[in-house]
């Protein structure tokens, strides 16, 4: 082979899809990065709420900090990731305000009243949560 001949590399990027095996090792970093992207300018830390660390069955708390590093607990979220049949579902709820609507994200977003479970309108500040739920679901559902 000549020194000037181009060398071609073939990468199988499918190996790097967020499969359960890959995500198990860094689920908290994945969730925090997605939250940082979808809920700017806030920064997020992720804490497990239970012992489960499987990407398809866990409860997490997102702790929010403002850009200056000051904690902002009013924006903290609880995220539940769970499998129902073959589908991956997420629920997102404000951690410190149990009266606010919660978001269920399966194949589409549904906002619900926490007391009754009845559908309701998306809150004014709900769009970033929908974006976060879509992004997380896309990252965690393996490609066919």
Report the location of each language-model feature:
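Generic "edge-of-domain/loop-turn" microfeature
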Residues: 67-71, 86, 99, 111
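Short, conserved beta-strand/beta-arch hydrophobic-aromatic motifs that form part
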Residues: 77-105
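Ampiphathic alpha-helical segments that act as solvent-exposed interaction surfaces
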Residues: 107-144
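Negatively charged, low-complexity tracts enriched in Asp/Glu with abundant Ser/Thr
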Residues: 2-78
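Generic marker of "main functional regions" within proteins
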Residues: 40, 44-48, 91, 114, ...
């Amino acid at each position: 082979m000549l020194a000037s001949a181009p060398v071609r590399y073939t990468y199988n990027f499918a190996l790097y899809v967020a499969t359960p095996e890959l995500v198990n090792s860094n689920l908290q970093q994945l969730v925090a990065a997605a939250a940082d992207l979808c809920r700017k300018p806030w920064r997020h830390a992720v804490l497990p709420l239970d012992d489960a660390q499987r990407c398809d069955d866990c409860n997490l708390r997102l702790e929010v900090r403002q850009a200056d590093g000051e904690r902002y607990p009013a924006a903290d979220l609880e995220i539940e990731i769970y499998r129902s049949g073959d589908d991956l579902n997420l629920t997102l709820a404000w951690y410190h305000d149990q009266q606010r609507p919660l978001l269920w994200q399966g194949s589409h977003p549904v906002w619900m009243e926490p007391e009754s479970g009845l559908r309701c309108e998306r809150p004014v500040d709900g769009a970033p949560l929908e974006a976060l739920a879509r992004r997380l679901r896309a990252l965690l559902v393996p490609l066919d």
